[in-house]
Amino acid sequence: MEINDFDKLGIKDVKKVYYNPDYETLFQKELEQQEGVETTLGAVAVDTGIFTGRSPKDKYFVKQPPSEKYIAWGDINQPISKEIFDELFEKTKEYLSGKELYVMDAFAGASDDSKKAIRVVTEIAWQAHFVKNMFIRPTEEELQNFHPDFTLYVAANLKNDRYKEHGLNSDVFIIFNIEENIAIIGGTWYGGEIKKGIFSMMNYWLPLEGKLSMHCSANIGDKDDVALFFGLSGTGKTTLSADPNRRLIGDDEHGWDDNGVFNFEGGCYAKVIGLDPEKEPDIYAAIKRDALLENVVVKENGEVDFEDSSKTENTRVSYPIYHICKHKEDLQGPHPKNIIFLSADAFGVLPPVSKLTKEQAMYYFLSGYTAKVAGTERGITEPVATFSACFGEAFLPLHPTVYAKLLGEKIDKHGVNVYLVNTGWTGGPYGIGQRMSLPATRSCINAILNGSITQSEYEILPIFNLEIPTYVEGVDPAILNPRNTWEDKEAYDRQLEHLAKLFIDNFKRYEGYGNFDYSKAGPQL
């Protein structure tokens, strides 16, 4: 993109365009413009300003044909008019006029059959760096013939001062115009808006092409056996998919087409609060030159204090995936052999591992369950159930059943085994029982991956009708059936019913969708 290309677009008097700059140029600009500081680890650390996380209430889709008939409108996918979009796009172009701009071209999707060409335009060097880290970097040849399928304009300091007149949530805006293949971001610096914005678009495009898009991590073994790990925040997805005996395909966003599984991204975006080099050596080793730290506290001597959460709990690092030693270079793999749903059940009633039928897999996928521990006024802590459809509802423009149906079809077609793994509590709920030990969970995962779990006999967990193995190598058989781990068996039965009711209540939202009653595969009271 040349300066006169911007002129035609309505972005006037651009001082200079940095078109796909290399890491060294970005590093120099970040320091020169005082956007960040160099740390003793070699990575630059930046602050994302007042927004240290996403702004989901400020995300909108332009409501217009033909996309309006596909989008699941509601609190997550909020509608906005074409007129308001046009007005804010004009403001965005005015705002970017007269500035030095960075244009970053990249791909979302490692599969040649499914990838999309993405362009990001921003005035901020570290945001360009973030895009270079997180998406798939084109070759020189690909850049020569690059034609974007979608362009995202970031105006981080632009506020919409007419938001009340427009009937919007705040002066921040993240708006997707599917028909024009454009998105605009205004008023927030947070890098995750760019990452998850493109993820939302992949979650729109791919299912309409009959391909499944997924919020999961993926790895591959020596026998080319692929495993997918789904789970909400705090369930152990990152930790459990980092396996010394397997190569990482990706840590967060994947597609599944007729050729197999592929990463959407070319990088990782890892949480670093409390990062311990002994517990997570891969992530720690990846934090070096070209990695980009967000919202960490840096001491005067340039050392990073990973324990300090004074800016936010959501401290992060982005880095190109080749910073991880054991990654699969083409970011792809064959159809998965195993799918693992991770739930941190703080009620302490789900088994450490259970095998799911296809119908149960669709049910638990649509439920997207975990339980968080929340503090109450009197200092009593009790679990709070969290349900997020498909383990990533915030990023799904289409109705969750669209993704569940595709998952069911693919499980059937490729004979995939699906398991539910509880990384939460055993022996009682939070406060009475204890957290499932990491070695026990790893042993369950290993038994799934090496196939030995299929040799076990199974018993049935009542109400939930889950198949529980009676033997898993490396796991104390006494903990495999959760009821056995509770001293008060009646209290366990009551808690199991309580959780079943929460599942049933959550699932009422799906009544009357499609021609299949998914609820039959869930708990029955």
Curated annotation (Swiss-Prot):
- Positions binding substrate in this chain are 54, 190, 196, 316
Matching CDD domains, A to Z? PEPCK_ATP (cd00484)
Q: In the record's cofactor note, how is the cofactor described as bound?
A: Binds 1 Mn(2+) ion per subunit.
Listed PROSITE patterns? PEPCK_ATP
- Top-level EC class: lyase
Extract one GO cellular component term from the record: cytosol
- Matching InterPro entries, A to Z? PEP_carboxykinase_ATP, PEP_carboxykinase_C, PEP_carboxykinase_N, PEPCK_ATP_CS
Binding locations of Mn(2+): 196, 215, 252
Instruction: Note one Pfam family from the annotation.
Output: PEPCK_ATP
One of the record's GO molecular function terms: ATP binding
Q: Which domain of life is it from?
A: Bacteria
Q: Does the keyword Electron transport apply?
A: no
Q: What does this protein do?
A: Involved in the gluconeogenesis. Catalyzes the conversion of oxaloacetate (OAA) to phosphoenolpyruvate (PEP) through direct phosphoryl transfer between the nucleoside triphosphate and OAA.
Q: Which family does it belong to?
A: Belongs to the phosphoenolpyruvate carboxykinase (ATP) family.
Output the NCBIfam families linked to this UniProt entry: pckA, PRK09344.1-1, PRK09344.1-2, PRK09344.1-3
What protein does this entry describe? Answer: Phosphoenolpyruvate carboxykinase (ATP)
Q: Which organism is it from?
A: Nitratiruptor sp. (strain SB155-2)
